[in-house]
Amino acid sequence: TEILRLMASGFSNKEIANSLGVAEGTIKNHVSNILSKLGVRDRTRAVLKAFELQLV
């Protein structure tokens, strides 16, 4: 949910990676998994769905 929270704050993958101290590729993988698990196709819809489900 930390990555979702940062996505909701408008952070890019690179900014999230820097914030968490991991590689940008790691964040890309996590974002891809988040989109898949939420059943959405883009970051905006993922954030909206996360709010609907009260994940953030």
Which residue ranges define each predicted feature?
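Short C-terminal tail/terminal secondary-structure segment
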Residues: Q54-V56
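Recognition helix of helix-turn-helix DNA-binding domains
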Residues: G10-R45
